Amino acid sequence: TSILDFTTQEKGQTLTEALDVWHKMADGKSSCDYGFHMSITDWNDESKKEIKEMTRQGVTSYKLYMAYDNLKVNDKELFEILSAIEEEHGIVGVHCENGDIIKAVTEKLKSEERNSVRLHPKSRPAEAEAEAINRLLTIAKLAGTPVNIVHLSSKQGLKVVQRARKEGQQVFVETCPQYLILDEKEYNRPGFAGAAYVCAPRLRKKEDREALWEAVEKNEVDMLGTDHCSFNMDGQKTRGKDDFTRIPGGIPGTEQRPMLFYQYGVVEGRTSIERMCQLLADRPAKLFGMYPQKGAILPGSDADLVIWDPDKAWTISAK
């Protein structure tokens, strides 16, 4: 009934210009209510001044990257952005991977091993996620702000969050279906088939999946997102046939999110239908400033209701 997409600021672009571009793509075309997380990639004095205007236009959530040279912010910028968003009572979600470490590991792999999709998981170790989470939480603590860890994928990263929470730090956590259901064996599919599962953070080990499910049941995960970023195999993923680093990172998930969590979480006895509603509706609405207009069945709330048939069978297909 409602989605929050990402609008990404290009280098040299103002936040307002970026938001306008994405509104033009969605206005009159979206089949449901929508809003935007603002991805800040070019932080400067003008961007800082625009934060109040973003609030006026309904933006309550921001996205930052600690990886990707064309997207990432440095530690100083991270501190400044966290502080600026806190003044507007917004929340910052962060892609936590140490981009420099990933780049160094990748260069070493390319010099020593034959190109293969199987190098993708080797190039993005769990340590790179855990280190970035630890650094982010240190910066957030110094800034005196809460922070949202998006698409948490690893047991190591989860342990960093658990430690910070024990020390009293306010940390929100999102994970995604791919990290609860799939694991790194998908990269061992024959030929180039594993490219379909190239994403970042990458799919982890079975023990990481189990740790995340345990965190879901212990109320240590606040939201189930998707990090939806769909690509065709032919013409897009195949760009990386001769160089695994050129495989576009991303998989879809928005449409399948409820059915996947219901099947692998509720039906298989890992969690409850009430927990599913919390992760998919209640918690996101509260964190992103939409509650009680969204995320609740209350007088005056939007009548955004999903009628769920637990007996319906689904087949996920590209056809």
Description of each model-found segment:
Residues T7-Q9, S39, A67, E97-N98, ...:
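Short, ordered loop/turn segments at secondary-structure junctions
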